[in-house]
Amino acid sequence: MHKEALAFPPEESTLFFINSHLIITYDKQYFVTLRVKYLISNSMSESKRIKTALVSVYHKEGLDEIITKLHEEGVEFLSTGGTRQFIESLGYPCKAVEDLTSYPSILGGRVKTLHPKIFGGILCRRGLEQDIQQIEKYEIPEIDLVIVDLYPFE
């Protein structure tokens, strides 16, 4: 394992959530390709295929590689302000969180994804018919992958 990746406290972190799995990466440059290959190879069987990714990051270094690999696998993106603009600048379509929630970003951009349509899509239990019926009733998209990092609160 790359020793610099274990430095603590990390200067920046990226959290990947995949259907109840969590991967924490501290060194984007070293792990980007490795982690994206892992995510795709271990999650892209038809039963666990990543179809939609919620992406909202402050530090965008290395994000282009992740987005490109996911786009190549047919993943659709859902994102917030600056991250959405970044994804679109790479030439990939991206749906705005605000369009899904019908609610604007508030408190200086710090509150964007705290909404039942977002959390419902992440927490939906795909094997439970009651959950599937509710997300269909409320038009909540399933969110299979979440990529976020920690906002530098000062």
State what each model feature region is.
Residues E4-A7, E11-E12, D27, V32, ...:
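Acidic, Ala/Val/Gly-enriched low-complexity intrinsically disordered segments
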Residues M44-L100:
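N-terminal glycine-/serine-/threonine-rich phosphate-binding loop
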Residues G82-E154:
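Glycine-rich nucleotide/cofactor/substrate-binding loop typically near the N-terminus or early
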Residues L22, D27-K28, V36, I40, ...:
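N-terminal regions of proteins, emphasizing targeting and processing segments when present
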